Amino acid sequence: MTLIKTNSPKLHREARLAREKLHLEGEVPDGVLRAEIDASWRRSLSHGVHFNAKHELALESSASLDVLLASNRLLIDAALPAIDYLAERQGKEGLIILANSDATILAVEGRADRLKGSGLQDITLGACWSEAVRGTNALGTALVEALSLIHI
């Protein structure tokens, strides 16, 4: 598991400048971003995902959600003890998300409502967070990079 500190003002400033360059020039600037983020931005561009697009991609019906959860029941059941343990350790402010190999959310524990102010409206069961659909994001990028991450 990799622990990445993401609240550094310098990192935020560099990412903002890189995002502005991407917006103005349509290219990912070389050498500015961490390697995995740089690679993710490039993959997102190749998928045709605009870096500033807003997507809400939950499943269309409760029947689809029932099928999704039923087809992932073994994973969910195996992960529940770990999710409960992490939720206990994190307290009320944390957020734990379990997703399948397609980056579709299967379980959410914690304060997803706290993210709504940052434009993340659909941290919900059945929402897809793959890079190919949404671009760079912690869940989709971790799956592509085959890394488990904790962001603080």
Language-model segments: what does each one mean?
Residues M1-E131, N137-T141, E145-L149:
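Intrinsically disordered, low-complexity terminal regulatory regions
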